[in-house]
Amino acid sequence: MAKGRHRRIESRRRRVTKRALVSGSVVLVILSTVMVVAYKKLEGNINTVSTEALGDRPTAVKVEGPKAPLNVLVMGSDTRDGANGKGIGGSTPGLSDTTMLLHLSADRSRAYGVSLPRDAMVNRPTCPSKSKSGPVPGGLTMWNSAYAVGGPLCTVKTFESLTNIRVDHFVVVDFVGFRSMVNALGGVKICVPEPVDDDIGHIKLPAGTYKVNGQQALDYVRVRHGIGAPTGDIGRMKRQQAFIAAMIQKVMSAGTLANPARLFSFLDAATKSLTTDEAFADLKQLA
């Protein structure tokens, strides 16, 4: 009888183990399917632009190893009309008021950013027009006009002609999308070191620490008036860099990474706001 009981127990164990393996396999298949669908959706959100029109470019630096460091030119597109211009008045023809070169290390563990002043006077090369109406003659002009006349390709071409540094990829972030990204995270905590009282941008903040929503964040990173030194575009660049660092910290926090719904909502908002070169639209490039 003992042997029979033992065989029955072993039989039940095998059935339980088999059911657990089958259930685990089903869950794994479902999770894999969800991940593939989510990946495809995020990748499909991104708009792309071909870089063929750039013509002659600086030579890419060759490095040993499976991965190379990347230079990514990040532009913030600000038309300031419609939903993008809420609360600021006026409109612009689509300037890039924010431009930053990000250098990603080969192992992708570090990133270094350098902001480019939008009001800097530069010699812009001849560029294909954004409206595809023919080439736009170059000349001495403000940095952010390159985006207005020729979009991201003219901005890349201008940067490369000035620095002889090859831009491996570019990313354009729409400011409306920026607002959605912050809201998807449930807000971002920032430190305001001195009072902000900007009648043009309609933003007033005493000095202190705040958790800002998307619209408040957008107003804050746009501010160029009504704030103590450093003022103007240089001060704004520093605030933008500090805010981006705070947003990245929120994305990488346990509260976001351990919350699949919040993480996907952020990634969905982020990818919907992006325009990149065709190669960079493959999300695996960031891995």
Predicted regions and their residues:
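Non-catalytic, solvent-exposed segments at the cell envelope interface
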Residues: 2-287
